[in-house]
Amino acid sequence: MASEVEDGVPVHEEFFLCGGVETQIIKCGPWTNLFDKQGVSKPKHLIFVIPGNPGLSPFYVPFAKALYSLVKGHFPVWIISHAGFCLTPKDKKILTAPQEPNAQEIEDIYGLNGQIEHKIAFLRAHVPKDVKLIFIGHSVGSYIALHVMNRAPELPVVHTFLLFPTIERMSESPNGKFATPFLCRFRYMLYAASYLIFKPCPEMIKSFIVQKVLEKMSFKSELRLTDLLQPFCLANAAYLGGQEMIHVVKRDDGIIKELLPKLTFYYGKTDGWCPVNYYEDMKRDFPEANLHLCEKGIPHAFVLGFSQEMAAMVADWINNRLPKK
């Protein structure tokens, strides 16, 4: 269903079955089906946003809208949910793509490896081969973006922007040291607590709680965010988080070296997930890399209050690299 937002940026929310699970896609721009030869002329590039964890797709809408406007509407901006991070509302249809080559389920789709395969499956099914891709990975979305490029080299990715990239030593980071015991040793207790508290909770109460939480964060959402309190989604976010602590350890220097001309890294100065020494190590090991260290005080969770600033930087990078059509 498409909705025209107040600032004139068309935003579409759709739900697809991808790899056997419900997947939310939020699309900024007039293009809803890139295979459709009728209507609006097909764009040459697609900006594809891969969120962090537990970054639900609607949190990225202000960023996507700002980015779409700043690239003058030349390229659509799509945000994909992680597998298991959304439940399709009763008033929405779950769509399928006739081009989808892999209707079979993806093994361990809620885990880190499965999330990578999930993104590959969607791109192969929903994006024509002649549409070039611009990836934006945030946090663990950066790790996923790198591995999508590595595993599916046929995808026409022209550039990837890795924002606050958690691509190494996650459990050793300041936040990781705190989170690892909860995500790896006590996650079943977290599952049980979320089910006991939120499973019997009426949707009206969940919506009220989410609304109050968003007000506290000064975040206005145009799309529903009650998945924040769905035990199914919380459990999958915790499971993925635990896998991140276990598997995102050694930096994949071989992949980075091979893809380096197509990569831009943006590190935070006060980031508890990828601290400054990770940036310094990257700068030492890859002196030719396109590396940036934040000078604007933008936090790791930039979608909470810094979407405009982040979109402005990414738009400048894109506008300086790509033709305007």
Swiss-Prot record:
Localisation per UniProt entry: Lipid droplet; Endoplasmic reticulum
Single GO term (MF): sterol ester esterase activity
Any GO CC annotation of this UniProt entry: endoplasmic reticulum
Active-site annotation: S139, D271, H300
Pfam family, any one: LIDHydrolase
InterPro entries in UniProt: AB_hydrolase_fold (IPR029058), LDAH (IPR019363)
Protein name: Lipid droplet-associated hydrolase
Gene: Ldah
